[in-house]
Amino acid sequence: QIERMANKMDLVILPIQGVSDDGFIELKKRGYCMKDFFASLRKETLIFTGVITPYIKKLPQTVISLLAREEVVAANAALTAEGILAMVIQNTPRSLPEYRYDVIGFGHCGRAIAGLFHQLGLEVRIVSAHAHPESAQLPYSFIRLQEWQFQQPWPVVINTAPAEVISEAMVAGWQTQPLIIDIASRAVGVSERVYKRKDTHVI
């Protein structure tokens, strides 16, 4: 039905992750093929998205990436950090200071989450695949991803890195299972097999 309305639309707002390479968008963990919809749009229609994917680049319409605007990125990261804080509160039985927090990735969202948690007096450790020259001046401890992957994680693990960083083999070697919150694009940070394990808590 939406394809029938496409040629009447002046503006289209896509999910933040945009459109996959094969023309699908994901809503509430369900995929929807949008090829016919995009083919029916007028060339004058404006398209707003978060991520500009290869599929979107090929469209003849004007595409505006909200994530290319620094103020939007900063606001989105701040809201994400607040949402993560709420998720931790809802999914842990003890008070926040009783836990320590691993934040994987030090991009906009990673920095916002670490900053908010630090402001609340919580102990935060940044897990990053890359060295950060400014780390000595920041109030967090830092550990390289390659080293962290062979250690017992802290009780709460928050992944922002857009790559698989937690495998089933890693989880199988942990003595205790942390709460894992994966907010990476398309939820790729945690292996699908980890989600299926009954002894892990992944959000």
Annotate the PLM regions:
Residues Q17-D21, Y32-L41, A136-I203:
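Rossmann-like adenosine-cofactor binding region
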Residues Q1, L120-L138:
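NAD(P)-binding Rossmann-fold cofactor-contacting core
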Residues L116, S128-H132, A161-V165:
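Active-site rim beta-loop-alpha module in soluble metabolic enzymes
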Residues Q1, S95-H118:
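Glycine-rich adenosine-cofactor-binding loop
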Residues V63, V124, P178:
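Hydrophobic anchor at the start of a short beta-strand
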Residues I13-P97:
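Glycine/serine-rich phosphate-binding loop and adjoining beta1-alpha1 elements at the start
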Residues D10-L11, L46, R100, V156, ...:
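Structural motif
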Residues T53, G107, A129-A131, A184-R186:
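Residues in the short beta-alpha loop(s) of Rossmann-like NAD(P)-binding domains
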